[in-house]
A protein has these predicted regions:
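A charged, aromatic-enriched C-terminal amphipathic alpha-helix characteristic of glycosyltransferases
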Residues: 11, 230-269
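Membrane-proximal helix-turn-helix segments that form the acceptor-binding/catalytic region
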Residues: 43-48, 88-105
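Short His-centered aromatic/hydrophobic patch
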Residues: 56-62
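Active-site proximal beta-strand in glycosyltransferases
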Residues: 53-55, 69-85, 106
């Protein structure tokens, strides 16, 4: 069974392909955000490709071109496409068209269900994968404790949280989102607490990777200031184990790959 995968998002397919390639013949058509790469070069790659099943990540031009020149079998929505872009005057029509025309629509985080099912009641939740054999539990904790927050384009760190962490003897590093993916496991292990996003009611992929690494998290689920008061070394160790168990049971890349392989076979059959 030949599967053509078009585009990637947050290294999701990069994480899944190693667990799928023994069963399927996979052609992975990647692109950059450059104008040429995401338009004419992408179109050429799609036209030249040959697959039994076409799987597209993200509901924009990639999916539209696959629908026009091949067959849009799987559309995997990852976030901003159905959360925000779908409402834009310029690109919303493409997202809606792709959702309606794909044979199967998948969504990566639980909060996307309400957005995807407005256009596809049969949309399926396929969890964001985490390579738990790469993001392994940390063994050493810092004294004083250290927290990390990655800057986001759509929200700011809650006002005063950095000061409150400092007063609680927790050092906070605020990082740009330019850490190479292969460096992320060792980067996360330098910290004890991961500060995630608050405006979106789901864990980011980096947060799940931090949880897999045994970090405690401050997230959308928390009142962030009262949450800080709970963060002593013993609680962090306990939460780290709980978080690791959660990711292993719900987001392990091998489990997600098994789910996706069943979906691919069902579409082909």
């Amino acid at each position: 069974l030949k599967v053509v995968i078009v585009n990637d998002c947050a290294h999701v397919m990069e994480d899944l392909i190693p667990y799928l390639s023994s069963e399927f013949e996979i052609q992975f058509l990647q692109r950059t955000r450059g104008l040429w790469s995401k338009t004419f070069r992408l179109l050429w790659k799609i036209i030249k490709s040959d697959g039994d099943v076409y799987h597209v990540n993200y509901a924009l031009q990639d999916a539209y071109l696959v629908d026009k020149f091949k067959h849009l079998d799987i559309l995997y929505c990852h976030g901003s496409d159905v959360r925000w872009t779908i409402h834009s005057k310029e690109w919303g029509w493409i997202v809606k068209s792709n959702l309606k025309k794909a044979k199967v629509v998948l969504y990566a985080t639980p909060d996307l269900k309400e957005h995807a099912t407005k256009f596809r009641e049969d949309a399926i939740y396929l969890p964001t994968p985490v390579k738990t054999d790469v993001f392994t539990p940390k063994q050493r904790y810092n004294n004083p404790l250290k927290a990390v927050y990655f800057k986001l384009p759509y929200e700011q760190l809650p006002l005063g949280l950095d000061i409150y962490l400092k007063q609680s003897n927790i050092a906070l590093d605020i990082l740009e989102r330019n850490v190479p993916y292969e460096k992320m496991p060792e980067t996360l292990k330098k910290y004890d607490v991961f500060v995630d996003r608050f405006s979106i009611p789901s864990f980011s992929k980096t947060c799940l990777e931090a949880m897999s690494s045994g970090l405690a998290v401050i997230s959308y689920k928390d009142d962030c200031f009262s949450r800080v008061e709970e963060l002593d070394i013993e609680n962090i160790k306990k939460e780290g184990k709980t978080n690791r168990d959660f990711v292993e049971k719900n987001h392990d890349a091998k489990l997600v790959a098994n789910q996706l392989s069943r979906i691919w076979r069902d579409v082909y059959d």
